[in-house]
Curated annotation (Swiss-Prot):
Residues 89-102 have a biased composition (Basic and acidic residues). The gene is rplp1. One of its GO terms (molecular function) is structural constituent of ribosome. P1 and P2 exist as dimers at the large ribosomal subunit. This is Large ribosomal subunit protein P1. Residues 84-113 are annotated as: Disordered. Plays an important role in the elongation step of protein synthesis. One of its GO terms (cellular component) is cytosolic large ribosomal subunit. Signal peptide: none annotated. The lineage of its organism: Eukaryota, Amoebozoa, Evosea, Eumycetozoa, Dictyostelia.
Length: 113
């Protein structure tokens, strides 16, 4: 794992720890946790994640994360594979409708004839 990803994850986990304990998520508190864990990160990460995590309802996010992830992927694949036959069926239906309209015109049964 790259150093940047490790730093990002460390800040995210720090934010989750603070939230779990009911403590307000701030850059200083994230820095304190990281120092206690002997993890060094770029100086901009704690402030960035503190501002980002302060805007998010973390418990709700965690509850909804598992419910839509895997289930959302399967229907997309199924819909994509089903879309091609459905499109072909629509084209065939339109062609048949056009032929029916033409046959009505040939019989002289138009409304304004």
């Amino acid at each position: 794992m790259s150093e940047i990803k490790t730093e990002e994850l460390a800040c995210i986990y720090s934010g989750l720890l603070l939230q779990d304990d009911g403590i307000e998520i701030t850059a200083d508190k994230i820095k304190t946790l990281l120092e206690a864990a002997n993890i060094t990160v770029a100086s901009h990460w704690p402030g960035l994640y503190a501002r980002s995590l302060a805007k998010v309802n973390i418990p709700e996010l965690l509850l909804n994360a598992g419910s839509s992830g895997a289930a959302g992927a399967a229907p997309v694949a199924a819909a994509t594979s089903a879309a091609a036959p459905a499109a072909a069926a629509k084209k065939e239906t339109k062609k048949e409708e056009v032929k029916k309209e033409e046959s009505d015109d040939d019989m002289g049964m138009g409304l304004f004839d």
